[in-house]
Amino acid sequence: MYGIPDRLKPLSAAEEQVLLALWDCKPPASRRDIGARLAAKGWAAATVLNFLYRLEEKGWVICTKEQNRNLYSPTVTRRAYGVFTMRQRLDTVFGGDLAQAVRALVSESGCSQS
């Protein structure tokens, strides 16, 4: 659906943050690299590792071994995920009506339509 395989399970907000950090790392990335991107959250290394494990179980991430460390890669692109999440919100909130969503965004944001 929208560039995202149907087999993928929904993400929690925290899992999404870890996936975003992974994309920012220019994958494949180690747990340490991903954790560094999430330092402001104050999560322990074990917490980041737990979220990576969940993402792997849900099919969003694959883990490969290189020497004695695990490297993580997303199974979908950031763009595909963005389209998928926007489409979900568009369908849920605006019944799939893009024009209605854009009108609401323009009127609520104070942007001009010109």
Name every feature range the model reports, one short phrase each:
Residues 56-66:
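A short, conserved structural fragment
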Residues 84-114:
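Amphipathic alpha-helical dimerization/coiled-coil segments
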Residues 1-8, 84-87:
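Short, Lys/Arg-enriched N-terminal segment that forms or immediately precedes the first helix
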Residues 10-14, 66-85:
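Short, cationic-aromatic polyanion-contact patches
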Residues 28-37:
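Short acidic, hydrophobic short linear motifs in intrinsically disordered regions
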Residues 9, 22-28, 41:
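Short helix-capping/hinge SLiMs at alpha-helix to coil transitions
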Residues 16-21, 33:
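Pre-recognition alpha-helix immediately N-terminal to the DNA-recognition helix
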